[in-house]
Amino acid sequence: MLRARPALWAAALTALTLLRGPPAARAGAGTMGAGPVVRCEPCDARAVAQCAPPPPSPPCAELVREPGCGCCLTCALREGQPCGVYTERCGSGLRCQPPPGDPRPLQALLDGRGLCANASAVGRLRPYLLPSASGNGSESEEDHSMGSTENQAGPSTHRVPVSKFHPIHTKMDVIKKGHAKDSQRYKVDYESQSTDTQNFSSESKRETEYGPCRREMEDTLNHLKFLNMLSPRGIHIPNCDKKGFYKKKQCRPSKGRKRGFCWCVDKYGQPLPGFDVKGKGDVHCYSMESK
Protein backbone atom coordinates (compact mmCIF):
# COMPACT_ATOMS: atom_id res chain seq x y z
CA MET A 1 0.00 0.00 0.00
CA LEU A 2 1.62 3.24 -1.18
CA ARG A 3 1.53 6.44 0.82
CA ALA A 4 -0.43 9.42 -0.49
CA ARG A 5 1.23 11.87 -2.87
CA PRO A 6 2.28 15.29 -1.50
CA ALA A 7 -0.02 18.28 -1.61
CA LEU A 8 -0.01 20.58 -4.61
CA TRP A 9 1.76 23.41 -2.79
CA ALA A 10 4.56 21.08 -1.75
CA ALA A 11 4.84 19.90 -5.33
CA ALA A 12 5.15 23.46 -6.56
CA LEU A 13 7.97 24.14 -4.10
CA THR A 14 9.70 20.97 -5.29
CA ALA A 15 9.39 22.12 -8.88
CA LEU A 16 11.03 25.41 -8.00
CA THR A 17 13.85 23.42 -6.42
CA LEU A 18 14.37 21.53 -9.65
CA LEU A 19 14.67 24.81 -11.53
CA ARG A 20 17.06 26.59 -9.22
CA GLY A 21 20.26 25.37 -10.90
CA PRO A 22 23.45 24.65 -8.91
CA PRO A 23 22.79 24.14 -5.18
CA ALA A 24 23.59 26.98 -2.83
CA ALA A 25 26.37 26.63 -0.31
CA ARG A 26 25.32 25.81 3.25
CA ALA A 27 27.07 26.93 6.39
CA GLY A 28 26.71 25.86 9.99
CA ALA A 29 23.37 24.09 10.36
CA GLY A 30 22.71 24.36 6.66
CA THR A 31 20.03 27.03 6.80
CA MET A 32 21.91 29.86 5.12
CA GLY A 33 20.43 30.64 1.71
CA ALA A 34 17.54 28.27 2.26
CA GLY A 35 13.91 29.14 1.79
CA PRO A 36 10.73 27.61 3.21
CA VAL A 37 11.07 24.19 4.84
CA VAL A 38 8.59 21.42 3.99
CA ARG A 39 8.69 18.93 6.86
CA CYS A 40 7.57 15.38 6.07
CA GLU A 41 6.27 12.81 8.51
CA PRO A 42 8.98 10.45 9.77
CA CYS A 43 9.33 7.16 7.92
CA ASP A 44 9.01 4.91 10.95
CA ALA A 45 8.73 1.13 10.95
CA ARG A 46 4.95 1.29 10.71
CA ALA A 47 5.08 3.46 7.59
CA VAL A 48 7.69 1.26 5.93
CA ALA A 49 5.65 -1.85 6.75
CA GLN A 50 2.77 -0.49 4.64
CA CYS A 51 4.96 -0.33 1.53
CA ALA A 52 4.70 -2.92 -1.21
CA PRO A 53 7.75 -5.13 -1.81
CA PRO A 54 10.42 -3.26 -3.79
CA PRO A 55 10.69 -4.08 -7.49
CA PRO A 56 13.17 -6.85 -8.36
CA SER A 57 16.71 -5.86 -9.18
CA PRO A 58 17.00 -7.02 -12.82
CA PRO A 59 14.41 -4.59 -14.23
CA CYS A 60 15.51 -1.79 -11.89
CA ALA A 61 19.06 -0.59 -12.18
CA GLU A 62 18.61 1.49 -9.04
CA LEU A 63 16.10 1.82 -6.20
CA VAL A 64 15.18 5.26 -4.87
CA ARG A 65 12.64 6.65 -2.45
CA GLU A 66 9.23 7.74 -3.68
CA PRO A 67 8.75 11.39 -4.71
CA GLY A 68 7.70 13.97 -2.16
CA CYS A 69 7.33 12.57 1.34
CA GLY A 70 7.00 8.93 0.32
CA CYS A 71 8.80 6.25 2.32
CA CYS A 72 8.61 3.31 -0.09
CA LEU A 73 11.22 2.31 -2.68
CA THR A 74 10.66 2.45 -6.41
CA CYS A 75 12.68 2.22 -9.62
CA ALA A 76 14.86 5.20 -10.47
CA LEU A 77 14.44 6.86 -13.85
CA ARG A 78 17.32 6.58 -16.29
CA GLU A 79 18.95 9.37 -18.25
CA GLY A 80 16.67 10.72 -20.98
CA GLN A 81 13.44 9.37 -19.47
CA PRO A 82 10.51 11.77 -18.87
CA CYS A 83 10.24 13.05 -15.32
CA GLY A 84 8.42 15.65 -13.26
CA VAL A 85 7.17 16.61 -9.83
CA TYR A 86 4.77 13.66 -9.56
CA THR A 87 6.91 11.02 -11.28
CA GLU A 88 9.60 8.75 -9.88
CA ARG A 89 12.97 10.24 -9.05
CA CYS A 90 15.92 10.31 -11.41
CA GLY A 91 18.88 8.06 -10.68
CA SER A 92 22.18 8.97 -9.05
CA GLY A 93 23.94 11.89 -10.68
CA LEU A 94 20.82 12.87 -12.62
CA ARG A 95 18.43 15.76 -12.19
CA CYS A 96 14.99 16.37 -13.65
CA GLN A 97 15.27 19.37 -15.98
CA PRO A 98 12.64 21.04 -18.21
CA PRO A 99 13.00 20.75 -21.99
CA PRO A 100 15.52 23.24 -23.39
CA GLY A 101 13.83 26.38 -24.69
CA ASP A 102 10.48 25.64 -23.03
CA PRO A 103 8.74 29.00 -22.33
CA ARG A 104 7.11 27.59 -19.18
CA PRO A 105 9.69 25.32 -17.51
CA LEU A 106 7.87 25.19 -14.18
CA GLN A 107 4.65 24.05 -15.84
CA ALA A 108 6.64 21.47 -17.81
CA LEU A 109 7.87 19.89 -14.57
CA LEU A 110 4.38 19.90 -13.09
CA ASP A 111 3.07 18.17 -16.24
CA GLY A 112 5.82 15.54 -16.19
CA ARG A 113 7.46 16.79 -19.40
CA GLY A 114 10.95 17.12 -17.93
CA LEU A 115 13.92 14.91 -18.78
CA CYS A 116 16.42 13.18 -16.51
CA ALA A 117 19.78 14.73 -17.40
CA ASN A 118 23.27 14.87 -15.96
CA ALA A 119 23.23 17.05 -12.85
CA SER A 120 26.42 18.78 -13.93
CA ALA A 121 24.92 19.83 -17.27
CA VAL A 122 23.37 23.01 -15.92
CA GLY A 123 24.20 24.98 -19.05
CA ARG A 124 20.86 23.99 -20.55
CA LEU A 125 19.05 25.96 -17.83
CA ARG A 126 21.34 29.00 -18.02
CA PRO A 127 18.78 31.13 -19.97
CA TYR A 128 16.23 30.57 -17.17
CA LEU A 129 18.45 30.95 -14.12
CA LEU A 130 19.97 33.84 -12.23
CA PRO A 131 23.76 33.79 -11.64
CA SER A 132 24.45 31.56 -8.66
CA ALA A 133 26.64 32.53 -5.74
CA SER A 134 30.26 31.44 -5.76
CA GLY A 135 31.52 28.77 -3.39
CA ASN A 136 28.78 26.24 -4.03
CA GLY A 137 30.16 22.95 -2.80
CA SER A 138 27.45 20.69 -1.39
CA GLU A 139 23.98 19.67 -2.42
CA SER A 140 20.92 20.38 -0.30
CA GLU A 141 18.70 17.70 1.16
CA GLU A 142 16.18 18.17 -1.63
CA ASP A 143 18.87 17.50 -4.25
CA HIS A 144 19.73 14.23 -2.56
CA SER A 145 16.09 13.24 -2.33
CA MET A 146 15.38 14.08 -5.98
CA GLY A 147 18.42 12.54 -7.61
CA SER A 148 20.20 9.95 -5.47
CA THR A 149 19.71 6.89 -3.27
CA GLU A 150 21.31 8.44 -0.20
CA ASN A 151 17.93 9.64 1.08
CA GLN A 152 16.18 6.37 1.95
CA ALA A 153 13.24 5.57 4.25
CA GLY A 154 13.63 7.73 7.34
CA PRO A 155 12.70 11.13 8.76
CA SER A 156 13.06 13.62 5.93
CA THR A 157 13.06 17.36 5.68
CA HIS A 158 12.90 18.98 2.25
CA ARG A 159 14.63 22.34 2.40
CA VAL A 160 13.37 24.35 -0.53
CA PRO A 161 15.66 27.26 -1.44
CA VAL A 162 14.54 30.62 -2.65
CA SER A 163 13.77 30.40 -6.35
CA LYS A 164 16.48 31.48 -8.77
CA PHE A 165 14.02 31.38 -11.65
CA HIS A 166 14.52 34.74 -13.33
CA PRO A 167 11.08 35.41 -14.92
CA ILE A 168 9.22 34.46 -11.73
CA HIS A 169 11.65 36.55 -9.68
CA THR A 170 11.07 39.61 -11.86
CA LYS A 171 7.29 39.22 -11.95
CA MET A 172 7.11 38.72 -8.18
CA ASP A 173 9.02 41.98 -7.62
CA VAL A 174 6.59 43.84 -9.88
CA ILE A 175 3.58 42.29 -8.10
CA LYS A 176 4.98 43.12 -4.66
CA LYS A 177 5.63 46.74 -5.68
CA GLY A 178 2.08 47.02 -7.01
CA HIS A 179 0.61 45.60 -3.80
CA ALA A 180 2.73 47.97 -1.71
CA LYS A 181 1.55 50.95 -3.77
CA ASP A 182 -2.11 49.89 -3.48
CA SER A 183 -1.75 49.34 0.27
CA GLN A 184 -0.24 52.80 0.71
CA ARG A 185 -3.02 54.38 -1.37
CA TYR A 186 -5.69 52.54 0.65
CA LYS A 187 -4.02 53.62 3.89
CA VAL A 188 -4.07 57.27 2.85
CA ASP A 189 -7.72 57.07 1.74
CA TYR A 190 -8.72 55.27 4.93
CA GLU A 191 -6.95 57.78 7.17
CA SER A 192 -8.61 60.63 5.25
CA GLN A 193 -12.05 59.06 5.69
CA SER A 194 -11.36 58.43 9.39
CA THR A 195 -10.34 62.06 9.84
CA ASP A 196 -13.49 63.29 8.09
CA THR A 197 -15.65 61.05 10.28
CA GLN A 198 -13.95 62.30 13.44
CA ASN A 199 -14.38 65.92 12.36
CA PHE A 200 -18.05 65.30 11.62
CA SER A 201 -18.57 63.77 15.06
CA SER A 202 -16.74 66.63 16.77
CA GLU A 203 -18.82 69.27 14.97
CA SER A 204 -22.06 67.49 15.80
CA LYS A 205 -21.15 67.29 19.48
CA ARG A 206 -20.54 71.03 19.56
CA GLU A 207 -24.14 71.71 18.53
CA THR A 208 -26.41 73.07 21.21
CA GLU A 209 -29.05 70.38 20.61
CA TYR A 210 -28.01 66.85 19.70
CA GLY A 211 -31.39 65.38 18.74
CA PRO A 212 -32.42 61.69 18.55
CA CYS A 213 -32.66 61.72 14.76
CA ARG A 214 -29.03 62.82 14.44
CA ARG A 215 -27.94 60.08 16.85
CA GLU A 216 -29.81 57.42 14.88
CA MET A 217 -28.32 58.66 11.62
CA GLU A 218 -24.76 58.53 13.01
CA ASP A 219 -25.34 55.05 14.44
CA THR A 220 -26.58 53.89 11.03
CA LEU A 221 -23.60 55.40 9.20
CA ASN A 222 -21.15 53.87 11.68
CA HIS A 223 -22.82 50.49 11.21
CA LEU A 224 -22.49 50.74 7.43
CA LYS A 225 -18.71 51.03 7.72
CA PHE A 226 -18.48 47.42 8.92
CA LEU A 227 -20.76 45.90 6.26
CA ASN A 228 -19.20 44.06 3.29
CA MET A 229 -22.25 44.64 1.07
CA LEU A 230 -24.61 47.58 1.02
CA SER A 231 -28.26 46.78 0.31
CA PRO A 232 -30.53 49.84 0.17
CA ARG A 233 -33.52 47.62 0.86
CA GLY A 234 -32.44 46.99 4.44
CA ILE A 235 -31.13 50.46 5.27
CA HIS A 236 -33.16 53.37 6.59
CA ILE A 237 -31.43 56.72 7.02
CA PRO A 238 -33.74 59.05 8.93
CA ASN A 239 -34.73 62.49 7.67
CA CYS A 240 -33.40 64.99 10.21
CA ASP A 241 -33.69 68.73 10.61
CA LYS A 242 -30.82 71.11 11.35
CA LYS A 243 -31.13 70.59 15.10
CA GLY A 244 -30.98 66.80 14.91
CA PHE A 245 -34.68 66.06 15.41
CA TYR A 246 -36.94 64.09 13.09
CA LYS A 247 -38.72 65.84 10.26
CA LYS A 248 -42.43 65.21 9.91
CA LYS A 249 -42.13 63.04 6.81
CA GLN A 250 -40.05 59.86 6.89
CA CYS A 251 -39.69 57.48 3.91
CA ARG A 252 -38.25 54.07 3.16
CA PRO A 253 -35.97 53.65 0.10
CA SER A 254 -37.44 52.38 -3.15
CA LYS A 255 -37.06 48.70 -4.12
CA GLY A 256 -36.41 48.64 -7.84
CA ARG A 257 -39.55 49.94 -9.55
CA LYS A 258 -41.53 49.78 -6.32
CA ARG A 259 -41.56 53.09 -4.49
CA GLY A 260 -40.86 53.13 -0.80
CA PHE A 261 -43.69 54.06 1.54
CA CYS A 262 -43.73 57.17 3.73
CA TRP A 263 -45.23 58.03 7.09
CA CYS A 264 -45.48 60.97 9.51
CA VAL A 265 -43.77 61.29 12.88
CA ASP A 266 -43.23 63.88 15.58
CA LYS A 267 -39.88 65.48 16.39
CA TYR A 268 -38.88 62.44 18.48
CA GLY A 269 -39.62 59.91 15.73
CA GLN A 270 -42.92 58.59 17.14
CA PRO A 271 -45.57 57.86 14.44
CA LEU A 272 -48.42 60.34 14.46
CA PRO A 273 -51.93 58.90 14.98
CA GLY A 274 -54.23 58.73 11.99
CA PHE A 275 -51.50 57.93 9.44
CA ASP A 276 -50.97 54.45 8.01
CA VAL A 277 -47.34 53.48 8.48
CA LYS A 278 -47.39 51.44 5.28
CA GLY A 279 -49.51 53.87 3.34
CA LYS A 280 -49.04 53.97 -0.39
CA GLY A 281 -48.63 57.00 -2.55
CA ASP A 282 -47.76 60.48 -1.38
CA VAL A 283 -48.32 61.22 2.29
CA HIS A 284 -49.00 64.84 3.20
CA CYS A 285 -48.09 65.43 6.83
CA TYR A 286 -49.89 68.27 8.54
CA SER A 287 -47.90 71.10 10.11
CA MET A 288 -45.25 71.64 7.47
CA GLU A 289 -41.78 70.28 8.16
CA SER A 290 -39.57 72.48 10.23
CA LYS A 291 -36.99 74.28 8.19
From Swiss-Prot:
The record's PROSITE patterns line, in alphabetical order, gives: IGFBP_N_1, IGFBP_N_2, THYROGLOBULIN_1_1, THYROGLOBULIN_1_2
Tell me where in or outside the cell this protein is found.
Secreted; Nucleus
The UniProt entry, under InterPro entries, shows: Growth_fac_rcpt_cys_sf, IGFBP-3, IGFBP-like, IGFBP_1-6_chordata, Insulin_GF-bd_Cys-rich_CS, Thyroglobulin_1, Thyroglobulin_1_sf
One Gene Ontology MF term: protein tyrosine phosphatase activator activity
UniProt keyword annotation of Secreted present: yes
Instruction: Cite a single Pfam family from the UniProt record.
Output: IGFBP
Domain (IGFBP N-terminal) spans: 36-119
As for what it does, the entry says:
Multifunctional protein that plays a critical role in regulating the availability of IGFs such as IGF1 and IGF2 to their receptors and thereby regulates IGF-mediated cellular processes including proliferation, differentiation, and apoptosis in a cell-type specific manner. Also exhibits IGF-independent antiproliferative and apoptotic effects mediated by its receptor TMEM219/IGFBP-3R. Inhibits the positive effect of humanin on insulin sensitivity. Promotes testicular germ cell apoptosis.
Fill in the subunit field for this protein.
Answer: Interacts with XLKD1. Binds IGF2 more than IGF1. Forms a ternary complex of about 140 to 150 kDa with IGF1 or IGF2 and a 85 kDa glycoprotein (ALS). Interacts with humanin; humanin competes with importin KPNB1 for binding to IGFBP3, blocking IGFBP3 nuclear import and IGFBP3-mediated apoptosis. Interacts with TMEM219. Interacts with RXRA; this interaction modulates the transcriptional activity of RXRA. Interacts with LRP1; this interaction mediates cell growth inhibition independent of IGF1.
Query: How is this protein named in the record?
Result: Insulin-like growth factor-binding protein 3
Organism expressing this protein natively: Bos taurus (Bovine)
Q: Which gene encodes it?
A: IGFBP3
